[in-house]
């Protein structure tokens, strides 16, 4: 059985205090290199803001099924909208959860035959007519967390001895923002406990807001350990592109969610902060590279320097029904 475990806890407000800044950067460096996961406090997002988005997350999943299916992601060539329980795949197996996927609110692109297919990942969201306040709250939340994530990314670069603005151009103008509202509806009838299967996030930074139920587990010392919820903190983890951009110096860590027991429901709101789809990710300069071990490549999961190719691959593999309906030519991505 996994044992209880506490991740490193970092207070982002210490970065603004000259007396504490050096210690904060040291702790951030260690957490990003050794663990790839941390609890983040001092981020400026209020308890009321967090409570509100969790309240509306619960309200969305309390809507009649017909209202949720009206915004099904099967309606969207941009992979936006509601995914029914068991209709998302991780590692080829069904996840026992349902969710609403939201990105930056942008017009549908005109994608020509010679344009990169990842341009389809931009476009409008789908919003439930029965819960009109959801749009404003989620988009505001997305903007708030993008600012927190960008600040944290800059501090992380400083912590490893790199220029703070190294990734600013890659995130300029149209960063790829993505928020999920997720429900884990208790145990699956089959007895399987895969709320979401083991995986690494393939992008840059993830900031997770979770309720009090728990279920997140992270690999440490060769086994999975529990990550109990910490009130007022986001769980932050690094994605594979940060590991690649630092030649394996920083760590992207496998994690999963175990379904809650019985009829207990778990709600969470992960936010993913990633660069423009057309951004090409280069190696971060710095003396740290002398200690970088390099990256082990997985032939079954190739990672590309151009961010959008990774993002598209992830969506096609996780939501094959959407891909078959709108993008059958991408089945082999």
Per-region residue spans from a language model:
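C-terminal flanking tails of non-heme Fe-dependent oxygenases
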Residues: 1-91, 96, 139-140, 144-333
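A short, charged helix-loop
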Residues: 107-137
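Core domains of carbohydrate- and sulfate-ester-processing enzymes
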Residues: 86-117
